[in-house]
Amino acid sequence: MIITNPNPPTSLTANTITTTSIKFSWVAPSIVGGSPVIDYAVYWDQGVASWTFRQNVTVNSYTSSGLSTGTTYSYYVLARNAFGYSLASSAGSWLAATAPSTPAPPVTTISGSNVIISWSPAPSANGSPITSYQIAIM
């Protein structure tokens, strides 16, 4: 049997993002080179264009903690078998932030067949810009 490097992991996906942590997962390589994957090497970039080894893990997920709110972090993963490491996965990049706080209750004005709804912006965006508001009419 010939053993070769595994294929890289795929589909890095953020599972949980907070102001100080990001949990992400990936799909294990479908071609493992004739030897099971032993572990995964996680690398990250803290927004300074310099990739750094973070940790080896034996499962296909990782939680990066101690992050700074409002900073974008990028990660890639390598799979390792008995022969060696795969090429790097495609990178995943996420912003350490949570949902913004709720804006003040809206003011509603009804005039004939028109309804005008207005509100003040949320007092805190928690490190991420507010890009839209959703209005539900019940």
Regions found by a protein language model. Give the residues of each.
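Disordered, low-complexity "stalk" and linker segments at domain junctions of extracellular
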Residues: L78, S113, S120, Y133-I137
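Beta-strand-rich modules
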Residues: S64-S86
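Solvent-exposed strand-loop boundary residues in beta-sheet-rich modules
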Residues: Q46-S50, F83
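Short beta-strand segments within Ig-like beta-sandwich modules, predominantly Fibronectin type-III
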Residues: T52-V59
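Accessory recognition modules or surfaces
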Residues: W44-D45, V57
